[in-house]
Amino acid sequence: MLDIDKSTVDFLVTENMVQEVEKVLSHDVPLVHAIVEEMVKRDIDRIYFVACGSPLNAAQTAKHLADRFSDLQVYAISGWEFCDNTPYRLDDRCAVIGVSDYGKTEEVIKALELGRACGALTAAFTKRADSPITSAAEFSIDYQADCIWEIHLLLCYSVVLEMITRLAPNAEIGKIKNDLKQLPNALGHLVRTWEEKGRQLGELASQWPMIYTVAAGPLRPLGYKEGIVTLMEFTWTHGCVIESGEFRHGPLEIVEPGVPFLFLLGNDESRHTTERAINFVKQRTDNVIVIDYAEISQGLHPWLAPFLMFVPMEWLCYYLSIYKDHNPDERRYYGGLVEY
């Protein structure tokens, strides 16, 4: 196990998470609402979120929210996919919202430039006001925070929640917006109470050479963020992500003793689908971890699961890496260390 002061590890964002979420709720969400006000004035009827990595997964979650509770046309597209296969419809009734923490992601900047050239409303969500991405967008929000999963998810959710509220009010959307007020306290509780369990699960998972992550519903994008982005980039663990409903259509054939699985189990309508996969796997291997939103939700809406489930996964992945004697901040290639 790596001997390290966790307060020095940039990967671990639990320390200031609550304060950052409180700040975004009070200061930055109203700025999102102002952008949505302009979108409504311009009769925007199509939204393209463009991002890469974890920011893309946050945007995908917001896209699923829109699909579930509205007829809004919302898309979440990887940067180069947007640039290489630019949507046929890109005009003055579209919005292109680029999400990039450092604001230097080449393809996201290019996507905003493409959108602006076609007359689309453009906005950028990034950490600093002087990020390069801000010059490519008509509007920008610099959130000044490090817990990017929570922040990006909150900003993208706020776009969708406000658009639905203004254009086609929905009772469930009202419940989600109301429960967001309780998010800081709920996150704080998990930060304080989940470290030891996360350590135990991380130690267990560190013994596995790779992990299959399985999720459904609003947790699908978080499943990718944790099972691919986090495991591969930060813990150097091989990973694969499977959508719960697709598990029986091929992937079930690799289940056997010793094969490791991580399940993210929500309490939305897709719960039974993931439970079916869990039951099948548990009959055939003991290497199973289940993170269950029903146990940590604190009564919050099922579509807030991606916010809360992040905390157990943050602790699990941190300790997984530490038990593998790997500092999650260490890189071999990423961030310009090697030409790509």
UniProtKB/Swiss-Prot annotation:
GO terms for biological process: fructose 6-phosphate metabolic process; protein N-linked glycosylation; UDP-N-acetylglucosamine metabolic process. PROSITE patterns: SIS. Induction: Induced by fructoselysine and psicoselysine. Makes part of the frl operon with FrlA, FrlC, FrlD and FrlR. InterPro entries: GlmS/FrlB_SIS (IPR035490), SIS_dom (IPR001347), SIS_dom_sf (IPR046348). Its EC number is 3.5.-.-. Keywords: Hydrolase, Repeat. Disruption phenotype: Cells lacking this gene are unable to grow on fructoselysine or psicoselysine, where they do grow on glucose. Pathway: Carbohydrate metabolism; fructoselysine degradation; D-glucose 6-phosphate and lysine from fructoselysine: step 2/2. Catalyzes the reversible conversion of fructoselysine 6-phosphate to glucose 6-phosphate and lysine. Functions in a fructoselysine degradation pathway that allows E.coli to grow on fructoselysine or psicoselysine. It catalyses: N(6)-(6-phospho-D-fructosyl)-L-lysine + H2O = D-glucose 6-phosphate + L-lysine. The keyword Cell membrane does not apply. PANTHER family: FRUCTOSELYSINE 6-PHOSPHATE DEGLYCASE (PTHR10937:SF14), GLUCOSAMINE--FRUCTOSE-6-PHOSPHATE AMINOTRANSFERASE, ISOMERIZING (PTHR10937). Homododecamer. The keyword Repeat applies. It comes from the Bacteria. Strongly inhibited by ZnCl(2). Pfam families: SIS. It comes from Escherichia coli (strain K12). Residues 35-169, 201-331 form the SIS domain. One of its GO terms (molecular function) is carbohydrate derivative binding. This is Fructoselysine 6-phosphate deglycase. Coiled coil: none annotated.
